[in-house]
Regions:
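Interaction-mediating elements
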Residues: 1-128
Length: 128
């Protein structure tokens, strides 16, 4: 049940944002094997003055198409994680986003760290 936050420069149309989020969802489905209805995504567009993208010494050139994808998820294997990075590149290429403009942060947690409402930890109670 991954939770995704996507941050990017402002300027994308509603259709472009929908296509972007759909592409990311397909990558997560493929790499993590989660059910299609497990979709929790937040998209935030930022003005130039509120978005700083610097080189970290890897000599990766960024453009205004850069997207930051922060994923909070239950523990995944290294293979699942590297598959996700590859699938994101494949899926986002159709949205005009090149691999140099995809930044991913994956944070894992445990079953006790999730509540989907009603003050319950559904992974612990067996509801999920």
């Amino acid at each position: 049940m991954p939770f995704l936050r996507v941050d990017a420069y402002e300027g994308r149309s509603k259709e472009q944002v929908k296509n972007l989020l759909d592409a990311i969802h397909r990558a997560v489905l493929s790499a993590f094997g989660v059910p299609p209805r497990d979709r929790y995504q937040v998209y935030q567009a930022h003005a130039d003055s509120n978005f700083i993208v610097q080189d970290t010494g890897l000599n990766i050139k960024r453009t205004r198409n850069v997207v930051f994808i922060a994923i909070t998820s239950r523990q995944r294997t290294e293979q699942q994680k590297t598959n996700l990075y590859s699938r994101l590149v494949e899926e986002l290429k159709a949205c005009g986003i090149e691999q140099n403009d995809i930044v991913v942060s994956l944070v894992t947690n445990s079953d006790a760290d999730w509540s989907f409402g009603n003050a319950r930890a559904q992974f612990l109670t067996g509801e999920l």
